[in-house]
């Protein structure tokens, strides 16, 4: 569908090792453009997104994302989306998509291919540590499927916990251990509620 919508694009299909960080890094290595754009499969950028990105780069913004709206009328998700207009580090996430010049991507080391979780946040934190981070004032839409399946407040509490664990010095291994325990507990609760 994407190829039909953008026939002028030169698309490459590439297989990489398991893990989102490894896969996105592999894509960056075969890309031949000056700007990299990472987009989750269930996120939909605004019309003319490429023009907004090129304009932002020309104005001296080597890395940024779009504002985000969930495809849901849940009041909490509306609030979360509203806060993505701010350039605060805590308001960032992979669902907002990520553009970065290839030069800056290489300079900060790109996606960490060794970590099994938190790859988007890891890259975003290094971008913030490097300098300013720009939010394009246009709206991207993203699926609320995971929130609907797991529960809005339960999933948001999980994200907040991981964020604060990392901010307080937790290692990726500690965060991953928490993630595995949380997933196991969530699956058990889901199974018991269905019985």
Predicted regions and their residues:
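Acidic donor-binding segment of Leloir-type glycosyltransferases
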Residues: 1-15
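Glycine-rich, basic loop-to-helix element that forms the pyrophosphate-binding segment
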Residues: 14-31
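Short aromatic/hydrophobic "clamp" motif used to bind/position activated sugar donors
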Residues: 36
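The conserved acidic donor/metal-binding loop of glycosyltransferases
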Residues: 40-46
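Conserved donor NDP-sugar-binding/catalytic core segment of glycosyltransferases
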Residues: 47-75
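A recurrent flexible, glycine/aromatic-enriched loop bordering the glycosyltransferase active site
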Residues: 63-71, 83-100
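Hydrophobic helical membrane-anchoring modules
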Residues: 129-195
């Amino acid at each position: 569908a994407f190829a039909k919508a953008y026939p002028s694009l030169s698309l490459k299909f590439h297989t990489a090792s398991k893990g989102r960080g490894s896969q996105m890094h592999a894509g960056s290595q075969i890309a031949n453009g000056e700007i990299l754009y990472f987009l989750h499969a269930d996120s939909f950028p605004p019309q003319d997104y490429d023009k907004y990105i090129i304009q932002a780069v020309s104005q001296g913004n080597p890395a940024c994302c779009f504002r985000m709206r969930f495809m849901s009328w849940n009041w909490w998700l509306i609030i979360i989306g509203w806060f993505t207009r701010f350039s605060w580090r805590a308001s960032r996430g992979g669902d907002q998509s990520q553009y970065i010049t290839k030069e800056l991507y290489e300079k900060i080391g790109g996606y960490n291919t060794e970590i099994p979780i938190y790859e988007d946040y890891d890259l975003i934190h290094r971008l913030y540590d490097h300098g300013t981070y720009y939010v394009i004032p246009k709206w991207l839409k993203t699926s609320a499927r995971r929130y609907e399946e797991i529960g809005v407040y339960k999933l948001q509490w999980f994200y907040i916990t991981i964020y604060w664990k990392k901010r307080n010095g937790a290692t990726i291994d500690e965060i991953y251990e928490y993630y595995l325990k949380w997933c196991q507990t969530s699956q058990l609760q889901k199974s018991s509620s269905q019985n």
